[in-house]
Design a protein with these regions (language model features):
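Class I S-adenosyl-L-methionine-dependent methyltransferase catalytic core
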Residues: 1-281
Length: 281
């Protein structure tokens, strides 16, 4: 089943969190001159038009990137993220396009770096391929993203980031994430892994945490932003990133900017944030 289309949700509060974390990890990895490998398992199309029927139908971006777009008090890290989105809008004042994870990464990768973007959705993949055809160091494939950890790791660079952000349409995605991490870590224990997760039902989210704890892998950091308290009602109340082998700067960077993000993205006052170790060093 491949019904999920990210265009309905592009630029929402979950994307803001995910893409700031992604940016900070890649910035920190790029402090070393040596090239790195970036794998994006569920790439989507890479770029989204916010005037599309899908985006306009939900309007989710208005409560995400839309709440940061014209702010003049952005913390330094958040300002760098907004600048990446402004580049995609040709520096204009109007917010017309939003970057998916692949486009965020493409703006940060250097000539010595390499990326693989995978997407299985038959409507999304041709758009993804077209959006990245000019990037010589980026490869796109219409393949199962979970399987790429086993197929492509370890990378020749021996440095890199794997982003796993499935739609969680199917309940087994929660288990497939853990299995993919096990396969990847077995081959590439020094790599950084970032897993995006939604909080729709808290017990589903805990399956990922418990599954990762059971692997015996160390250095697992959880970063979460909630827009309202957990609920049995339908809808996503929070989202987060689990980062394995995070750059040492990441924990403090997120602790410093999450109070601002929570206050700005959730002005109603129902938001909260968490940065904590699921498994320490």
């Amino acid at each position: 089943m491949l019904s999920y289309r990210h265009s309905f949700h592009a630029g929402n509060h979950a994307d803001v969190l995910k893409h700031i974390v992604l940016m900070l990890i890649l910035e920190n990895l790029s402090l070393k001159e040596k090239g790195l490998y970036y794998l994006d398992t569920h790439s989507g199309v890479g770029r989204y038009r916010l005037s599309s029927n899908e985006s306009e139908k939900t309007g989710e971006y208005k409560e995400g990137i839309g709440r940061l777009w014209e702010r003049t008090d952005l913390p330094e890290e958040v300002a760098r993220y907004v600048d990446l989105i402004k580049k995609l809008n040709y520096g204009g004042k109007e917010l017309r396009y939003y970057a998916g994870s692949p486009m965020i990464a493409a703006q940060l990768l250097r000539s010595q770096d390499r990326a693989l973007l995978t997407e299985l959705h038959p409507s999304d993949f041709p758009l993804l391929r077209n959006n990245f055809k000019e990037f010589k160091n980026i490869t796109t494939k219409s393949e199962n993203g979970f399987q790429q950890l086993k197929a492509t790791l370890p990378p020749k660079e021996r440095r890199g980031l794997v982003l796993i952000d499935p739609p969680y349409e199917l309940k087994e995605d929660y288990d497939l994430v853990v299995k993919a991490i096990e396969e990847g870590y077995k081959r590439f224990a020094t790599g950084t892994y970032a897993i995006w997760y939604p909080v729709v039902l808290r017990q589903q989210t805990k399956r990922i945490f418990k599954g990762l704890e059971a692997t015996g892998i160390r250095k697992i950091l959880k970063i979460e932003l909630a827009v309202r308290p957990d609920s049995d009602q339908r809808g996503m109340t929070a989202s987060g990133m689990v980062v394995i082998n995070p750059p040492w700067q990441l924990e403090q960077q997120m602790k410093s900017i999450l109070p601002y993000l929570t206050q700005t993205l959730v002005p109603e006052g129902t938001g909260s944030w968490t940065v904590e170790w699921i498994v320490p060093e």
